[in-house]
Amino acid sequence: RVLRSILVSTQFVVSMILMIVTSVFFMQYRYMINYDLEIDEDNVMVFSVDNIPEGKEETIVQELQTNANIADVTASMTSFFGENASVNVRDFNGKSVDFNVWYVRGNIFDFFGIPMIDGDGLNANSTRWDFVINSYMNQNTGLNIGDKMDTYYTVKGISQDIHNMSLRNGHVNSAYYCSDSFNWYYLRLHEGADVKDVINFVKSTVNEIAPLADEPDVEFLNENIKRIYGDVKKQTILIG
């Protein structure tokens, strides 16, 4: 009888744990695809490109901007969404600071409508030595406008926190370094744009500038986010 009670209790505890884990996974998936990411994602398409010839990343941006259907273009080295940031550890004021890093085009904050809480942020005149931190990192580390990291890199702005990562860890220390090396491109289309024309134009542009690259899959950002977090949904189903 005692053994039976132990087995029943153990089964109950395991069941409760699985229910909690399933709920967390489902909440993360549901949030990322249905709730406000605190960015302007309307009419945004995304694609990635491999095997870009050195120095041609910005050429792709400039060529895409010639299409009448496309209102604006920005880019990043890794996907701006999902858990694709690199994690750096640096010393600041005698304290070890770990933070997530994205390398981005200077206009990415304007493109996604991410406001600066302080400072000018990044722009077309920014250099590779300029970077922006999020509000969470500012409050957590004391880094502020004008402070330097690794002697040369200077904080140019403090951005509003956004939900471009997993909910699992909530907001994290995030830094966005200005770069001219990209693999991910984001297009904002005009209202009523010819989507098929845009997709064909993207593919022909990539083929012309980066002939060794695979043909890109061009999709709307919301579909991209659903796909990124598809594994989370699968885990939810498997665990449940």
Model regions and ranges:
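Structured, solvent-exposed hinge/loop segments at the ends of secondary-structure elements
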Residues: 26-139
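Short, flexible micro-motifs
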Residues: 18, 122, 160
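Small/polar loops that bind or transfer phosphate-bearing groups
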Residues: 21, 100-101, 190, 217
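Alpha-helical architecture
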Residues: 9, 13, 26, 103, ...
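Helix-terminus/capping and membrane-interface signal
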Residues: 1-73, 197, 214-219, 223-240
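"Rare, low-scoring activations can occur
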Residues: 55-72, 135-144, 151-236
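Short, solvent-exposed coil/turn segments
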Residues: 2, 40-42, 94-97, 126, ...
